């Protein structure tokens, strides 16, 4: 993702042919590391292709994916509502465990300093 973002930033800034050095400079300017293999793979995949063409193809693929994934989104949305109800029970059990541990750590002093 860093490589793609750096490439698009270079293109948006007016650099018609960003080089490997340009991408490294952009990524390293924000303190991130970049993998040379990923850069090489990226440039081999986009060789002789236009960015707007690549974006258009990507949009078409995303549109095709989103039309088939509607049922999954609905199913996962319903399951998300049950999670908060289960969470307080786990919090309560953790509190009980902590209280139990504290009482055991008294060393027989029966909460002398509480």
Curated annotation (Swiss-Prot):
Q: How is it modified after translation?
A: Phosphorylated.
Q: Which InterPro entries match?
A: P1/P2_N_sf, Ribosomal_P1/P2, Ribosomal_P2
Per the UniProt entry, what are the Gene Ontology biological process annotations, in alphabetical order?
cytoplasmic translational elongation
Q: GO: which molecular function terms? A: structural constituent of ribosome
Disulphide bridges: none
Keywords noted in UniProt: Phosphoprotein, Ribonucleoprotein, Ribosomal protein
Pfam families of this UniProt entry? Ribosomal_60s
Q: Which residues carry this modification: Phosphoserine?
A: 103
Subunit architecture: P1 and P2 exist as dimers at the large ribosomal subunit.
Function of the molecule: Plays an important role in the elongation step of protein synthesis.
| Family as reported in the entry's similarity comment | Belongs to the eukaryotic ribosomal protein P1/P2 family.
**Protein name, as recorded:** Large ribosomal subunit protein P2v
Species annotation: Arabidopsis thaliana
Report which gene this protein is encoded by.
Answer: RPP2E
